[in-house]
Amino acid sequence: MNTKYALVTGATAGIGLDIAKELASQGKNIILTARREDRLSEISISLKDEFNIECDYVVADLAQFSAPDKIYNFCSENNYIVEILVNNAGYSINKKFHETSEDEEEKFLR
């Protein structure tokens, strides 16, 4: 069965988590993605129980070049149709620019 989903990146905290909850409250099925499997699992169970929706997750670090393919393959293998994409994942450096290393700057730009 092909079921429509909203895919939310950076879904374990902050704006991403709030958006996932709001979409779930509207009856949307959700695919969560972030780096922390423990939080993804907890949130997935919570959204299913509270809003009676389908919810799944894929662990992915969008700073890695392979992450989009991993997410795409996960959705494809499970026959999930992504009808809404919330590209929320982000990375910040809590330093002044002149104090950052080249590695930190490269990670930030990805």
Language-model segments: residues:
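The beta1-alpha1 cofactor-binding region of Rossmann-like NAD(H)/NADP(H)-dependent oxidoreductases
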Residues: D38, V59-K70, E102
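Hydrophobic/aromatic anchor residues within beta-strands of the central parallel beta-sheet
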Residues: C55-Y57
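Residues forming the Rossmann-fold NAD(P)(H) cofactor-binding site
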Residues: L17-K21
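Conserved catalytic-site loops of classical short-chain dehydrogenases/reductases
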Residues: E83-I84
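Conserved NAD(P)H cofactor-binding loop of Rossmann-fold oxidoreductase domains
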Residues: N88-I93
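Conserved glycine-rich Rossmann-like NAD(P)H-binding loop of the short-chain dehydrogenase/reductase
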Residues: Q26-I43
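Substrate-binding pocket helix/loop in short-chain dehydrogenase/reductase
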Residues: K96-L109
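Conserved glycine-rich cofactor-binding loop
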Residues: Y5, T12-G14
